[in-house]
């Protein structure tokens, strides 16, 4: 069976030309060249916003004072906008002034580092790597 292969007969030029013509016409039917573009009415259209930092787009627009005041008011902190807190979270730190005037010379509240002779001596020993805890 493997030895009984049929050899294809070479088609004549007329038949070959007819096949190529059918292929060419089929390609022309399926291929569509778009030269006119339009918006599809069934698709959702996205609005294209202008560039706010572009100087050439905004030449004709005058500055709106009311809009600028609104932006400046929104940029202020809540303490400048409102006389009292608006939420419970704002209550923390709303009054930033200390309740008691801090006195820097009061030893009960202020514990500053004090360098005396013994502390300077011990700091020097530690910087040299000596340790006398076990003596």
UniProtKB/Swiss-Prot annotation:
One of its GO terms (cellular component) is sperm flagellum. Keywords: Cell projection, Cilium, Cytoplasm, Cytoskeleton, Flagellum. Residues 75-100 are annotated as: Disordered. It comes from the Eukaryota. Pfam families: FAM183. Disulfide bonds: none annotated. One of its GO terms (biological process) is flagellated sperm motility. One of its GO terms (molecular function) is microtubule binding. Its main location: cytoplasm. InterPro entries: CFAP144. The keyword Cytoplasm applies. It is found in: Cytoplasm, Cytoskeleton, Cilium axoneme; Cytoplasm, Cytoskeleton, Flagellum axoneme. Microtubule inner protein component of sperm flagellar doublet microtubules. Microtubule inner protein (MIP) part of the dynein-decorated doublet microtubules (DMTs) in cilia axoneme, which is required for motile cilia beating. Belongs to the CFAP144 family. This is Cilia- and flagella-associated protein 144. It comes from Bos taurus. The gene is CFAP144.
